[in-house]
Amino acid sequence: MFKNVIGLIVEYNPFHNGHLHHIQEIDRLFDDNIKIAVMSGDFVQRGEPSLINKFEKAKIALSQGIDIVIELPTFYSTQSAEIFAKGSVNVLDKLSCSHIVFGSESNNLDKLKRIATISMTKEFELSLREFLAEGLSYPTAFSKALFDEKLSSNDILALEYLKAIKGTNSKIEPYSIQREKTGYYDDEKDNFSSATYIRKILLGNEKKENKLNKIKNLVPEFSYKILEENFGVFSCLSNFYDLIKYNIIKNHSELKNIQDLEVGLDNRLYRHSLENFNFE
């Protein structure tokens, strides 16, 4: 019986040095642990296909110290941060995890807990709806409802994890780790970078050798090996543009029924699908 059953909520799209740091910090902080990763599969929270398939991602995770990989169902993995978090926390709770450990830009767990409590009140919900009714995007409306409190991408996810734990009366203990060096859209710093930056390189227009050289120091050796083996078969949204365009035009009247679709976005998608011949 392990003393600490640690839950991680991950996408590994792709697995990079920051992810390895996350695992190493868990081993440093929690002795006698088993690490269970709930991972999005072939489709990720951005609603995009994963760069490499879920089996390759799981293979990398297991090679780098994760003990068990559980796939997060696509219904949850492609949703908003709130539903993504609820589904993930529910899985970890059912697996009797003692802790959930996540990266955070602020690494201020007490502050995030206070914000989580506020954001679950009726007053906050009313304020949020009012800002959304003004046509603001969800992140902007959320920030304004919190009196212009600015949260970075991983802090927003951390907040949703805390809300999910509180909302389900889970006994899981949350723990935050300082996110190393870079933010979601940042470039390379001291061999740390965001997954977004790595995908940008790999899906860019440079030669294969140049791309691989640029990411070699940003990912662990085994992750690099898998990415090299899968080079040329990476998945990205633009690969599916013809199918997406066909469905938008064919099912234009039904687009408004998509969950969380902002008012008017259905018409914009339809108009641009008629006018454009490629994803860019």
Model regions and ranges:
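N-terminal catalytic cores of NTP/NDP-binding nucleotidyl/phosphoryl-transfer enzymes
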Residues: M1-K57
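Contiguous, function-dense segments enriched for cysteine-driven chemistry
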Residues: F2, V69, I83
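Short beta-strands and strand-loop turn motifs
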Residues: L8-I9, V38-M39, I70-L72, Y175-I177
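Non-catalytic positions within long, well-ordered alpha-helices that form the structural scaffold/packing
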Residues: R28, L62, L92-D93
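A glycine-rich helix N-cap at a beta->alpha junction
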Residues: K59-P73
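Active-site cores that bind ATP or allylic diphosphates and position pyrophosphate for catalysis
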Residues: L72-E280
